[in-house]
């Protein structure tokens, strides 16, 4: 079932949003891309991996580039799932960008002696004392080894793009959520006109737990008041819920109650 995103038609067209997403550099996820030329070999020796018995090299910088492509696709999947999930993700990305920009502005290389990435042990890379002087999660890069001007420029560009997306997405409240409204209409039609006598069961599958939680929070009470039916939320994260009092949150209990035959 195809659905628009915004009942008010104020959210940008999907093509426009997709173009904006494709413009994102997501620089924070590719720190090796911004390592200075005179330092690239040091990082290659630390992070690149030999493959095929030494016949080839799996470059970490290529892995980061692939990750960025996957993240762009994931953003579109999040938007396809629900505007709520999409808003959470782009807001998180925006916060990460702002945090990195603050770290760059606060960076002072004079506070510490020059470091060499090859001489640092893994345990040192996780040190809280060094955290302010580097970025990255699994792949650590020292700020002193980066082209911070170019890195900051790409982060600032991402901040502009992400800010515009977040502002538009936050405007699509549950009251304006076209997909949520269509789902309610579909559920109501199924309950009021069941294919089989007295079969009012409706199962909604989603790939993302936060979408499931969002749907439950806006459908459960409505379904009870408008349709006289109970609802349950089942996720893999242990956040199960149901409108049936006294049932608890045990997965098997909920499934048995809502579908005793199966």
Q: Each PLM stretch: what is its role?
A:
Residues 262:
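Donor nucleotide-activated moiety binding/catalytic core segment of transferases
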């Amino acid at each position: 079932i195809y659905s628009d995103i915004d009942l008010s038609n104020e959210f940008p067209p999907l093509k426009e949003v997709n173009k904006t997403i494709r413009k994102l550099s997501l620089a924070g996820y590719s720190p090796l891309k911004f390592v200075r030329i005179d330092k690239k070999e040091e990082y290659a020796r630390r992070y690149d991996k030999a493959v095929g018995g030494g016949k080839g090299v799996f470059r970490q910088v290529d892995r980061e580039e692939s990750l960025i492509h996957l993240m762009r696709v994931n953003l579109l999947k999040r938007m396809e799932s629900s505007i709520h999930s999409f808003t959470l993700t782009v807001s998180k990305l925006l916060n990460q960008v702002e945090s990195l920009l603050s770290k760059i502005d606060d960076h002072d290389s004079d506070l510490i002696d020059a470091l060499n990435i090859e001489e640092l042990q893994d345990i040192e890379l996780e040190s809280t004392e060094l955290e302010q002087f580097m970025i990255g999660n699994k792949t650590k890069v020292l700020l002193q080894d980066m082209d911070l001007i170019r890195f900051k420029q790409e982060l600032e560009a991402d901040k502009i793009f992400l800010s515009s997306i977040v502002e538009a997405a936050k405007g699509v409240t549950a009251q304006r959520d076209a997909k949520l409204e269509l789902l309610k209409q579909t559920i109501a039609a199924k309950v009021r006109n069941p294919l089989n006598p007295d079969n009012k069961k409706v199962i909604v599958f989603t790939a993302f737990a936060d979408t499931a939680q969002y749907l439950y929070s806006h459908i459960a009470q409505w379904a009870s008041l408008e349709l006289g039916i109970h609802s349950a939320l089942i996720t893999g994260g242990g956040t199960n819920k149901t409108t049936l009092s006294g049932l608890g949150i045990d997965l098997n209990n909920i499934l048995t109650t809502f579908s005793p035959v199966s």
